Amino acid sequence: MRSATLLLVSCVLLSFILGNVKEVEAVLKPMDQCGRKDIFLGGCGSNGSKTCINDFVKKGGVAAKPSSCECDDFGEEHLCRCYVPC
């Protein structure tokens, strides 16, 4: 009886954990968005997200405008990681 209870509790806990992981993944990346990375000259500045959005628009036009970005400085360049419409 003890082992059956332990098995049941383990299955319930595993179910909650797996369900939570799927919810977190859904929040992290919208389904209609694709990730893009690119390196640009200069630094991120005080608002790196806005810098990256402007860099992508300059490179690819308004159609390439990302919805959100992260910016990392690398010497005289910066790396932009953004989500754009697929």
Curated annotation (Swiss-Prot):
It is found in: Secreted. Keywords: Antimicrobial, Disulfide bond, Fungicide, Plant defense, Secreted, Signal. Residues 1-26 form the signal peptide. Disulfide bonds join C34-C86, C44-C71, C52-C80, C69-C82. GO terms for cellular component: extracellular region. One of its GO terms (biological process) is killing of cells of another organism. Coiled coil: none annotated. Transmembrane segments: none annotated. It holds the Pfam family SCRL. Belongs to the DEFL family. This is Putative defensin-like protein 234. It comes from Arabidopsis thaliana (Mouse-ear cress). The gene is SCRL14.
